[in-house]
UniProtKB/Swiss-Prot annotation:
Gene Ontology, cellular component aspect: cell outer membrane
UniProt protein name: Membrane-bound lytic murein transglycosylase C
GO MF entry, a single one: hydrolase activity, acting on glycosyl bonds
Subcellular location(s) of the protein: Cell outer membrane
Cross-referenced InterPro entries: Lysozyme-like_dom_sf (IPR023346), Murein_transglycosylaseC (IPR023664), Murein_transglycosylaseC_N (IPR024570), Transglyc_AS (IPR000189), Transglycosylase_SLT_dom_1 (IPR008258)
Lipidation positions, renumbered (S-diacylglycerol cysteine): 17
Catalytic activity: Exolytic cleavage of the (1->4)-beta-glycosidic linkage between N-acetylmuramic acid (MurNAc) and N-acetylglucosamine (GlcNAc) residues in peptidoglycan, from either the reducing or the non-reducing ends of the peptidoglycan chains, with concomitant formation of a 1,6-anhydrobond in the MurNAc residue
PANTHER family the record matches: MEMBRANE-BOUND LYTIC MUREIN TRANSGLYCOSYLASE C, SOLUBLE LYTIC MUREIN TRANSGLYCOSYLASE-RELATED
Major localisation: membrane
E.C. number: 4.2.2.n1
Organism from which the protein derives: Escherichia coli O81 (strain ED1a)
Class of the enzyme per the UniProt entry, highest EC level: lyase
Membrane topology: Lipid-anchor
Pfam families (UniProt xref): Mltc_N (PF11873), SLT (PF01464)
Length: 359
């Protein structure tokens, strides 16, 4: 297991200085950092495959919390999009005991991402008096789970009634799946409404847009990470959007990982970046609806890439946009932007924002 320990030791060093996404300027150091992070993730995935088997690699992402323990033999996976929690183990001895511990800890974990290393098997999950999943999961009696006694009883129920096993030809995988409550997304969103309202007032950005960005980026997962090392609820990258915001606020350097994993700081930084896109980078677009479409797309792929859809000259691009209807701007960005991800992103955020405006 030495190579896995080595991976865990170097992970914080590589992750802390890697970046991509949400910006148009990348210097050579950032490219090297991104390549280093890609290498790390590739090695991490390869190691998981060696332990779990082919097609069994599951790694944390923007909308997926994945934590390995027990020398990588047990994992907890929360899919925030699907609303499912899957606890699995390949432990050869007492698999039920491994599952039971993981179930209890997952149900009772707090909401401090900076205290948990998702790229190692260190059991650093602490039981919280205010569990992150409280209200998003109910036990077999229909009650929310706050205390260890109720979590333990629910774990015993699950192991007795919902334990499954399967073979991948290499290992026997034991698992338990828990469905979250139907409105789990709203439950998570509600946790951050106060922070969203504060950032909205501070920067003059519509609450519905902030919430739509959060839903699209992370599904309100405070543990959100990505292969491009975007962090937290609004998936802010330290060296691009984070650095731009710090510079605009008269701060030197870049926001730390712990800063961006703090929900209030992440929402503040992400909203500040939206304001910069709206007021500075894309401020030459007159129609507020057209500008909103451009801002949304730029949050994903950068302001420069948005303007280049219309012209390589930024001023001319804004002038062209100003001759178009908002509907034509939307149609152009969702069909002609070079990034398929950015094209879909505008559709997703715009759709989500409509739902928040109706509330």
């Amino acid at each position: 297991m030495k190579k896995y320990l080595a991976l865990a030791l170097i992970a914080p060093l590589l992750i802390s200085c890697s970046t991509t996404k949400k910006g148009d300027t990348y210097n050579e150091a950032w490219v090297k950092d991104t390549n280093g992070f890609d290498i790390l993730m590739g090695q991490f995935a390869h190691n998981i495959e060696n332990i779990w088997g082919f097609k069994e690699v599951v790694i944390a992402g923007p909308k997926d919390y994945v934590k390995y323990t027990d020398q990588y033999q047990t994992r907890s996976h929360i899919n925030f999009d699907d609303g499912t929690i899957t606890i699995e183990t390949i432990a050869g001895t007492e698999p039920a005991a491994h599952l039971r511990r993981a179930i209890i800890k997952t149900l009772l974990m707090g909401d401090d991402p900076s205290s948990v290393d998702l790229y190692s098997d260190v059991d650093d999950i602490t039981i919280s008096k205010e569990p992150f999943l409280y209200g998003q999961v109910v036990d077999n009696t229909g009650q929310p789970i706050r205390w260890e006694g109720r979590a333990s009883n629910f774990a015993d129920y699950l192991l007795k009634n919902r334990l499954k096993s399967r073979s991948n030809g290499m290992r026997i995988i034991y698992s338990v799946t828990i469905n979250m409550v139907p409105n789990h997304l709203d439950k998570r969103a509600h946790k951050y409404l106060g922070m969203v309202r504060q950032a909205s007032r501070k920067y003059g950005v519509d609450e519905s847009l902030i919430l739509a960005i959060m839903q699209t980026e992370s599904s309100f997962n405070p543990y959100a990470v990505s292969r491009s090392d975007a962090l937290g609820l609004m998936q802010v990258v330290q060296h691009t959007a984070g650095k731009d915001v710090f510079r605009s606020q008269g701060k030197s350097g870049t926001p730390s990982r712990s800063f961006l994993f703090d929900p209030a700081s992440n929402i503040d930084t992400g909203t500040a970046y939206l304001a910069m896109l709206n007021n500075v980078y894309l401020g030459g677009i007159d129609n507020p609806t057209s500008r909103r479409y451009a801002v949304i797309t730029a949050y994903n792929g950068g302001a420069g890439s948005v303007l280049r859809v219309f012209s390589n000259d930024k001023i001319q691009a804004a002038n062209i946009i100003n001759t178009m209807t908002p509907g034509d701007v939307y149609q152009t960005l969702t069909t002609r932007h070079p990034s398929a991800e950015s094209r879909r992103y505008l559709y997703k955020v715009n759709t989500a924002q409509k739902s928040y405006r109706r509330r």
